[in-house]
Amino acid sequence: MTRLKELPLTALQFYATAPYPCSYLPNKTARSQVATPSHLIHADIYNELLNAGFRRSGLYTYRPYCDECKACVATRILVNQFAPTRSQRRAWKKHAGLVASVLNLGYQEEHYQLYQNYQNQRHAGGDMDSDDQDQYMQFLLQSRVNSRIVEYRDGPQDPHPGRLRMVSMIDLLEQGISSVYTFYDASDTTASFGSYSILWQLEQTKELNLPYLYLGYYIKDSEKMSYKAKYQPMEGLIDDHWQALTGS
């Protein structure tokens, strides 16, 4: 793990949480290392933390700090070398009619309702399916970096023009875009909204002439997290170094 003294973060303090049940691997406990105080974690500092394996959830900046497990691997896609698979090309074509709008952070009831429906359909019984408005806003609408909402609606040629289908939260950083969270209309089981959102973010990163799309943690043995290795070429932060990660 990257040594904290190597980071230009002398004003920050870091602490380890108490163990808690792992959300991704059964019968495992997890711990996190948290960076504080949050008001000092502006864009430049967060960019350094991101490259050291940290992520943020609202104003909470953390990285895995488990005692006997290194399953969580921070990932980033090499944007200029990305080569879509056949299924990814199909997803891009299928949802090409969606209209994406980039918005400033702000509460919209329509977004919150889609978030609730997504959690109830995709993650029922989890920690987030009962989030109230305050929890939703703390999780997704609080940020001290350059963050945006991307909403995707059915286009004018669709039978339901303007219908909200998906929302993504992204951070615009020095070396790329960091994909924070995406939720979508999970009632359409034939859709590939999640894949499309990643492909859209890749295109935006390329247009900004930035090298990386940060996708969060890859966990090989977790169905919820292993899909990320489908986006190649990808690098993972392993033994303090960014190196090729194929997922095989």
Curated annotation (Swiss-Prot):
Source organism, top-level taxon: Bacteria
Reactions catalysed according to its record: N-terminal L-glutamyl-[protein] + L-leucyl-tRNA(Leu) = N-terminal L-leucyl-L-glutamyl-[protein] + tRNA(Leu) + H(+); N-terminal L-aspartyl-[protein] + L-leucyl-tRNA(Leu) = N-terminal L-leucyl-L-aspartyl-[protein] + tRNA(Leu) + H(+)
Cellular component GO terms, alphabetical: cytoplasm
Biological process annotations from GO: ubiquitin-dependent protein catabolic process via the N-end rule pathway
Compartment(s): Cytoplasm
Listed Pfam families: ATE_C, ATE_N
Keywords (A to Z) from UniProt: Acyltransferase, Cytoplasm, Transferase
Record-level Gene Ontology MF annotations: arginyl-tRNA--protein transferase activity; leucyl-tRNA--protein transferase activity
Keyword Transport appears in the UniProt entry: no
Function according to Swiss-Prot or TrEMBL: Functions in the N-end rule pathway of protein degradation where it conjugates Leu from its aminoacyl-tRNA to the N-termini of proteins containing an N-terminal aspartate or glutamate.
Protein name stated in the entry: Aspartate/glutamate leucyltransferase
Species assigned in the record: Polynucleobacter asymbioticus (strain DSM 18221 / CIP 109841 / QLW-P1DMWA-1) (Polynucleobacter necessarius subsp. asymbioticus)
Gene: bpt
